[in-house]
Regions:
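Protein-protein interaction and targeting regions used for scaffolding, dimerization, and localization
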Residues: 1-58
Length: 58
């Protein structure tokens, strides 16, 4: 898997996790050119997920 694909997967996985924990305040859906996101996103957790994917973490 190339770097872009790893980062995209990390973003999708983290946003999915945040969606499950948000009690309906965050929604994420596939859109024509990416994702459609509504609600609060924990940007620090998202950044850590991206950094972990680049560094080869889980």
């Amino acid at each position: 898997m190339d770097l872009e694909a790893q980062i995209a997967e990390a973003i999708r996985t983290e946003l999915s996790r945040q969606t499950e924990e948000s009690q309906g305040r965050l929604t994420v859906a596939d859109a024509d050119q990416g994702l459609e996101i509504h609600g609060p996103v924990d940007i620090e957790a998202l950044a850590m997920a991206i950094a972990g994917s680049v560094a080869g973490g889980p």
